[in-house]
Amino acid sequence: MIYPDETMLYAPVEWHDCSEGYTDIRYEKSTDGIAKITINRPQVRNAFRPLTVKEMIQALADARYDDNVGVIILTGEGDKAFCAGGDQKVRGDYGGYQDDSGVHHLNVLDFQRQIRTCPKPVVAMVAGYSIGGGHVLHMMCDLTIAAENAIFGQTGPKVGSFDGGWGASYMARIVGQKKAREIWFLCRQYDAQQALDMGLVNTVVPLADLEKETVRWCREMLQNSPMALRCLKAALNADCDGQAGLQELAGNATMLFYMTEEGQEGRNAFNQKRQPDFSKFKRNP
């Protein structure tokens, strides 16, 4: 996507509703390559239940495999909350949150991994409260655009919960060990400027400009090489994610190699039942 005039980055976005079949989220796509997933439970500050997470997983998978989508926005309905974390009213006694059939889930962990491994940038658009599991979700996104009314923090130790995975380790990478311990141990809340100062968000904008500025950031990324963005995301993740991160980065390297004449020579030779001839390819220093 090319925007010859910078003012076009702020042009009104045309959203197409793709929400059929969903009850807890709204799912939309723009005409210029942006998908938007909105947690639609404002009556509970967009807290998620197992169904909410299941629908977000489905929508993000659709956005990943849609060739017309280059970047994804994750947000919450209304201006009062991005997401307040897991809905404590459906938290059960057997290790998770109950669905309508009584089965317990922690499927938000699957959604965290999905955001992390999605080869397309995922941008959190945060207004109001981003608390608990919702705070972890915004951290998992590649970028966070916050409204001036955004509030950030963890509540786990106050409600008998914690996220010892990315919610702790990745937070420490972002804000440092001491600050991460403060955020988790004290369960304080932080305003948007404080979050910006500690590196939890990328920018803070007036609430009225939140979507406009988020779309601008998305459109800027859409002008860049999708393969470069994909590999950069994998490389940045690999710094934190151990062998799983290396596997993701290596998979992208394999994909690039498959696109080369050298890689295709090996495949063609196998299919043609002949010895491959790699002598024509340079051995660069």
Swiss-Prot record:
Residues engaged in binding hydrogencarbonate: Q154, T155, G156
The GO cellular component terms are:
cytosol
Cofactor(s) needed for function? hydrogencarbonate
**What's the superkingdom here?**
Bacteria
Its pathway is: Quinol/quinone metabolism; 1,4-dihydroxy-2-naphthoate biosynthesis; 1,4-dihydroxy-2-naphthoate from chorismate: step 6/7; Quinol/quinone metabolism; menaquinone biosynthesis
Q: Which reaction does it catalyse?
A: 2-succinylbenzoyl-CoA + H(+) = 1,4-dihydroxy-2-naphthoyl-CoA + H2O
**InterPro entries tied to this protein:** ClpP/crotonase-like_dom_sf (IPR029045), DHNA-CoA_synthase_MenB (IPR010198), Enoyl-CoA_hyd/isom_CS (IPR018376), Enoyl-CoA_hydra/iso (IPR001753), Enoyl-CoA_hydra_C (IPR014748)
**GO molecular function, a single term:** 1,4-dihydroxy-2-naphthoyl-CoA synthase activity
The Gene Ontology biological process annotation of the record reads:
menaquinone biosynthetic process
Sites marked Important for catalysis: Y97, Y258
Pfam families for the chain: ECH_1
Top-level EC class: lyase
Provide the E.C. number(s) assigned to this enzyme. 4.1.3.36
List UniProt keywords, sorted A-Z: Lyase, Menaquinone biosynthesis
Task: Kindly list the positions annotated as binding substrate.
Answer: 45, 84-88, 97, 129-133, 155, 161, 258, 273
The record describes the protein's role as: Converts o-succinylbenzoyl-CoA (OSB-CoA) to 1,4-dihydroxy-2-naphthoyl-CoA (DHNA-CoA).
Q: What does the subunit comment say?
A: Homohexamer.
Q: Which family does it belong to?
A: Belongs to the enoyl-CoA hydratase/isomerase family. MenB subfamily.
Give the protein's recorded name.
1,4-dihydroxy-2-naphthoyl-CoA synthase
Organism, by scientific name, is: Salmonella typhimurium (strain LT2 / SGSC1412 / ATCC 700720)
